[in-house]
């Protein structure tokens, strides 16, 4: 099958890979677009793994305020000041800040979660499953699945991206590392919401942010 310029363009837009890399992947995949995308993704992930050990000490702190009701500060690091000034990097950090406003994660990644919190959640879920009358032999597997779901809800890198739920924030970060060519790291964030911790009328500001991001 002949590889057309339109095919190369489509794959390039989808993956952010170089033109020659796209052409090689399409040739290797005999023109199969999905297979070519997978080949590039695998190569991109390999490149990301090599970059992961490099120190990312530059970057930016981005702020996002939604209607004076929700505020977010997030620090995302890059290896160089040059990348920190790159518009694509800035847009990515802005998206992360808005995502945090919308979803209210508690941690950046799983290894930040206190093991005692996980243990307490396991105990609660085990009791809940047994009270539901579930057989003991399947309770452990059920609890494992529910703990995984719990961690996905509270850890930023595991959350489905508000703008595109087919990918997680972790996937998005990996894509940006492969595309930009530097190690990037979401280091920390803080989120404030007016009246947080005070009993008040229920208002879903997070849903408002998600709708705004979808525009």
Swiss-Prot record:
Q: What InterPro entries does the record tag this protein with?
A: EF-Ts_dimer_sf, Transl_elong_EFTs/EF1B, Transl_elong_EFTs/EF1B_dimer, Transl_elong_Ts_CS, UBA-like_sf
Q: Give the keywords, sorted.
A: Cytoplasm, Elongation factor, Protein biosynthesis
Among the GO molecular function terms of this UniProt record, one is:
translation elongation factor activity
Which Gene Ontology cellular-component terms appear in the entry?
Answer: cytoplasm
> Where does the record place the region Involved in Mg(2+) ion dislocation from EF-Tu?
80-83
Cysteines paired by S-S bonds = none
Give a yes or no for keyword Transmembrane in this entry: no
Q: Does the keyword ATP-binding apply?
A: no
- One Pfam family assigned to this protein is EF_TS
Protein name in UniProt: Elongation factor Ts
Species, as recorded:
Alkaliphilus metalliredigens (strain QYMF)
What gene does this protein come from?
Answer: tsf
């Amino acid at each position: 099958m002949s590889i057309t310029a339109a095919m190369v363009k489509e794959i390039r837009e989808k993956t952010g890979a170089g033109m020659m890399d796209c052409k090689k992947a399409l040739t290797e995949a005999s023109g199969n677009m999905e297979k070519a995308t997978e080949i590039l993704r695998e190569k991109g992930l390999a490149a990301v793994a090599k970059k992961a050990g490099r120190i990312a000490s530059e970057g930016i702190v981005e702020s996002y305020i939604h209607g004076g009701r929700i505020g977010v500060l997030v620090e995302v690091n890059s290896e160089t000041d040059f990348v920190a000034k790159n518009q694509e990097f800035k847009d990515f950090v802005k998206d992360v800040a808005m995502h945090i406003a919308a979803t209210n994660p508690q941690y950046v990644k799983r290894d930040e979660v206190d093991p005692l919190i996980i243990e307490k959640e396991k105990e609660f879920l085990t009791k809940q499953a047994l009270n539901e009358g579930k057989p003991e032999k399947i309770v452990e597997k059920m609890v494992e699945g529910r703990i995984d779901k719990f961690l996905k809800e509270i850890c930023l890198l595991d959350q489905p991206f508000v703008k595109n739920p087919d990918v997680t924030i972790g996937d998005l970060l990996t894509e940006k590392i492969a595309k930009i060519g530097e190690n990037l790291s979401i280091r920390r964030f803080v989120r404030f919401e007016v009246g947080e911790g005070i009993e008040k009328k229920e208002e879903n500001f997070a849903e408002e942010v998600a709708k705004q991001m979808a525009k």
